[in-house]
């Protein structure tokens, strides 16, 4: 095939880069790091570095703790505590230890720190009057030795259950793969597992089984390997996606595959080797996977090609970034090989048969289609039209501005004609078929890497050069009777991922008397509201978002809820909750003095932590809780001193 010579050159470079990366990482001896939970005892993981989560590549490893909190967490090597973070979300309670080799280990979702660190943190929290802190102690204030107990495991922050999250980072704070350091506590003899492969046409002239679009194929397992028995017919530019994951011994969890290689006729065309993930590029995860499939089905497909806007640098490919071109009748063997960190491997083998265009070989039609409809796949508009009763296909007339274009059907599926329009040629506003006109809701083509201002009657948007990964086709809409009294603003399709913030202005037709408590909320498919914020500027309300979809305006005039659980001289515990805009802040004072209250959003509880354990909690108690809309709830009570009882 035409790309073979290029592939051989790329492959040689790839092995050199791969070897250099491996050598740099493994300059650290295997026994340099101690396993931080029950060292020397067999353990299992709930997550690995490079695993596909719903919003990101998982970093580090999630070490299971038997469903309990409070296990000793050990320093992995000599060093000093360089950072301490406390947050109700994210990593929760976390320690960062810098080591003599320049690397940093991270221990997250902790229940509590050891006494000296704990007292230092509490002192800083009282000094700053804030539960959430990000501290950088003086170097060697807290020196540690390998094996020291530095904390106890927990479930703090955005943790779904008790475990220890453990990172190893290089001197630039990029995340490395802890399993590369050969911890004997983890056993993995299971090979990666494949569930599906997907092929996608990359332009309107390409076909898969003589059809345009994206098509998934189930696989058949044979030992640790997988096959697709029947050849898949292809023509033109084709991209490949893989739904696969790794598994480890004695655990049900799906974990990450760090290395995937795709070959055509024994020539490598794509390789990904995930050994390092820089946080500055982490949002590119949305362009590594098929984001649209994630949103529609929840499945996480690896793209085995480098899509436009993807800035990760752990790929090596052919000259077309992993996209395959088939233009000569021939049958080709594709092999996709997967390795996990422990070099367990499996492969998927299938044949691709390049044929010249003809009618589809598997005429299944489009079930339930009884009228014309359309969809967009990347840069192509696909129009489906039921063939008239006389059985004759008719050309479609596409209208774009003052121009019209007569387009024949690209192919026919049973009783449905399929018409393809390249949107980079121009945005059609309508199509006429059999004297029936269908209008398209495509309001603008928004380019990436350019600033762009969008204006409509109810929505305005400002896109920066970094807002988008790739060109999108924006559709906006407005419903003046949402939920009977509100209004709904439709801003694009959530099939598109967003790299960085888009500044959006909503221009409502309705009047909102209490603007101070009226804000923007995103609305999901189930009708749930999520606070997005916004500030009023004349008749517009402006906010920033990294999500396309539906938005509405809601006035929240209901204050948060406060429920006392424990109030005595030793401990204060409250449950706080807000049913719409969410908790923004809380503050508790005793005799006008600020009291530290830890916060766990999962349980909605706050609880007191004394600066001086010997000092009883007594006097005038005032707890103020404020939501994101500015509503405030105040609880007042008095704690009597012991000699007043």
PLM region spans:
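Bacterial Sec-dependent N-terminal signal peptides
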Residues: 1-29, 33
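Long, low-complexity serine/threonine/glycine- and acidic-rich segments characteristic of extracellular
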Residues: 145, 187, 202-205, 212-357, ...
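Short edge beta-strand/loop segments characteristic of extracellular beta-sandwich folds
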Residues: 241-245, 381-388, 505-509, 571-579
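C-terminal beta-strand-rich structural cap/linker in extracellular carbohydrate-active enzymes
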Residues: 423-434, 540-559
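Proteolytic processing hotspots in large secreted/extracellular or virion-associated proteins
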Residues: 445-449, 472-519
């Amino acid at each position: 095939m035409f790309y073979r010579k290029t592939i051989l050159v790329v492959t040689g470079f790839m092995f050199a880069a791969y070897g250099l990366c491996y050598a740099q990482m493994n300059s650290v001896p295997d026994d340099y790091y101690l396993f931080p939970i029950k060292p020397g005892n067999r353990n299992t993981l709930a997550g690995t570095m490079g695993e596909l989560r719903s919003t990101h590549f998982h970093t580090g490893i999630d070490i299971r703790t038997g469903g309990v909190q409070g296990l000793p967490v050990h320093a992995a090597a000599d060093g000093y505590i360089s950072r301490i973070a406390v947050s109700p979300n994210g990593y929760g309670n976390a320690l960062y230890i810098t080591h003599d080799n320049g690397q940093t280990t991270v221990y997250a979702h902790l229940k509590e720190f050891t006494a000296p660190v704990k007292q230092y943190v509490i002192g800083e929290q009282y000094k700053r009057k804030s539960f959430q802190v990000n501290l950088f102690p003086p170097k060697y204030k807290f020196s540690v030795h390998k094996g020291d107990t530095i904390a106890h495991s927990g479930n703090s922050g955005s943790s779904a259950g008790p475990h220890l999250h453990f990172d190893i980072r290089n001197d630039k704070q990029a995340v490395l793969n802890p399993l590369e350091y050969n911890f004997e506590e983890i056993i993995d003899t299971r090979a990666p597992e494949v569930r599906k492969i997907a092929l996608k046409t990359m332009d309107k002239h390409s076909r898969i089984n003589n059809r345009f679009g994206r098509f998934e194929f189930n696989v058949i397992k044979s030992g640790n390997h997988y096959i697709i028995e029947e050849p898949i017919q292809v023509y033109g530019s084709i991209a490949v996606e893989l739904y696969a994951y790794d598994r480890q011994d004695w655990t049900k969890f799906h974990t990450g595959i760090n290395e995937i290689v795709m070959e055509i006729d024994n020539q490598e065309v794509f390789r990904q080797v995930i050994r390092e993930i820089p946080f500055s590029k982490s949002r590119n995860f949305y362009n590594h996977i098929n984001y649209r499939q994630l949103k529609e089905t929840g499945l996480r497909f690896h793209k085995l090609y480098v899509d436009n806007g993807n800035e990760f640098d752990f790929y090596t490919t052919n000259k077309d970034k992993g996209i395959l071109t088939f233009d000569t009748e021939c049958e080709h063997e594709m092999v996709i090989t997967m390795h996990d960190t422990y070099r367990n491997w499996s492969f998927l083998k299938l044949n691709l048969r390049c044929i010249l265009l003809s009618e589809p070989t598997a005429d299944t039609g489009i079930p339930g289609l009884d009228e014309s409809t359309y969809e967009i796949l990347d840069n192509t508009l696909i129009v489906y039209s039921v063939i008239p009763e006389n059985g004759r296909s008719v050309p479609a007339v596409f209208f774009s501005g003052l121009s019209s274009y007569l387009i024949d059907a690209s192919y026919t599926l049973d009783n449905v004609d399929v018409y393809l329009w390249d949107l980079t040629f121009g945005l059609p506003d309508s199509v006429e078929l059999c004297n029936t006109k269908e209008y398209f809701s495509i309001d603008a083509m928004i380019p990436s890497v350019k600033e762009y201002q969008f204006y409509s009657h109810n929505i305005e948007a400002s896109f920066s050069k970094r807002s988008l990964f790739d060109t999108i086709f924006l559709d906006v809409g407005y419903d003046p009777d949402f939920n009977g009294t509100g209004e709904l603003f439709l801003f694009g399709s959530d099939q598109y991922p967003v790299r960085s913030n888009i500044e959006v202005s909503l221009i409502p037709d309705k009047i909102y008397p209490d603007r101070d408590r009226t804000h923007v909320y995103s609305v999901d498919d189930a009708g749930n509201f999520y606070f997005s914020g916004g500030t009023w500027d004349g008749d517009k309300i402006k906010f920033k978002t990294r999500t396309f979809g539906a938005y509405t305006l809601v006035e929240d005039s209901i204050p948060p809820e406060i429920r006392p659980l424990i109030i005595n001289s030793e401990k204060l515990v409250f449950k706080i909750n807000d049913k719409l805009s969410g908790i923004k802040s809380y503050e508790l004072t005793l005799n006008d003095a600020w009291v530290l209250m830890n916060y766990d959003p999962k349980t909605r509880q706050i609880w007191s932590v004394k600066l001086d354990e010997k000092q009883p909690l007594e006097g005038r108690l005032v707890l103020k809780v404020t939501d994101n809309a500015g509503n405030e709830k105040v609880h007042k009570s008095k704690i009597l001193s012991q000699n007043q009882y």
